[in-house]
Each structure stands twice: as C-alpha cells, then as structure tokens.
C-alpha cells in the first residue's frame, strides 16, 4: 500500500459527484482527473507539475491536442483530461462540477474556471491516452439526442446564474460567445444526429440565449467560425440554411478569383483555406435538413 493514495467510495451518483468528492478530500497542491477507461504516460504528471510551477498558473492545459486547438486567450472549455488545476483555485472560488448534468459537466466546469483566471500554462508534452469504444461515453452520447436536447437549457441556466453572480456579462462576453459556439452549436447542433424538428428547436435555443445576453459587437467578432457567424446573421432556421448554401457558392467563386493572384504562396494558401471552409459547409448541409 501507498499512504499517498486514498480510495473513496459512494453510491453511483454520476461523474460530477465522484469528482467533487475527490476534490473535497484531496490534500495535494494540484488536481488531475483521469477517467477509468483511460491511462497516462509515466511522465504525464511530472511534465504538468513542472509546467504549472514554472508558470505559477491556476490551470495548465494538458496535451498537444488541446494546446494546439485554441489560441491561448480564446479557450472556451476543456474536457477533464485536458485540465491540471491548482487545488486551492476551485476551493477559494467555490467551484464544483455541476451534478445532475451530463454531458457537458466538464465543459461547464472548465468554462467557469477559465472565466475566473488569466494564469494559464500549456504543457503539450503531457501525453494522455484516451480510449474510444462503442460503449464509451462519447459514442453513447451521440445516440441520446432525445435526452440531450432538454439538457441544453439547463446548461444555459447554470451559465446565466454563474455570470450574474460573478458580474461577468460585460467583462467575459467574448468568452461566453465562444463557449456557445463550441458546445451547443458545433458539438451538438452541427455534430449530433438530431431530427429536423430537434435541430430547429436547438437553433432557437441558441439564438434566444445570444439575443438575450450577448452584444452585437461580440457576435460580429472575426475570430468566430463562419458557420456560427451565419447563424448569428440569420433571421430563422430556414434563413440559416439559405445563408449556408450561399456561402458555399461564394467560396467557389472566390477560389476561381484566386487564379488572378500574382503571388503563388498566397494563391496556394488561399485555395487551401477556401477548400477547408467549403468542405465544412458541405458537411453541415449533409447533417442538417432545412
């Protein structure tokens, strides 16, 4: 036995309850979360500890995948496997994983952490091995559209409560908009096999929340992805579909105009970017029926 290791037991009340129990009983300087299906490299914790101590950070982003995914100042949320957290930070800010919420309990928790700190470090050397299989959470979640759709307003209600209590609506408006783009829009509306009526309901949920809480200036930010900007400009679900189709045609026209660009490297880069945008738009139109 190792005296540094403690085993805690409780009735199965979900992953949030288990993580919160662990946080309340932890005594070290840092918190790290590893799911039961996964495993970590031998040097995983050492890399994270060194990076966190060097940066005196509240949160360290773990792994190259997550370090590369977002610009340093524009991370809307992270999965628990991408989080290495100074233990005192959630304690002094009264932060816990939201219980009774699944999926997105980790997204909400990390979003709240990121909203409250600028002291973030990055550790691409930390290697986390994530197992994917048919019975895994990710695959099961994609099949449960009827359960997840009514869960999304609960996410937004928790966000409203958090931003209201901490007076963050103005100061962290951009952070909030990027979360809405990432979680309910990209990961749910665009990626999950909702039925057409469910897609229209989710579209309305997203638009109503943004109209209520986010300024037009934040919603026009160029850093937002094109499909999300099209949603923000649309007047309804059908109009969103028309804008997607029009954007796909426009990328084809722009690609032809690049033929007249005199700089070969600009021409190649422009074509690659337009190809990527067009493929993304085509995939969205295949997934969503307007």
Question: Language-model segments: which ranges?
Answer:
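Short, contiguous, well-ordered secondary-structure segments
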Residues: 82-85, 90-91, 185, 203, ...
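Secondary-structure edge/capping motif, primarily at the C-terminal ends of alpha-helices
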Residues: 162-166, 187-194
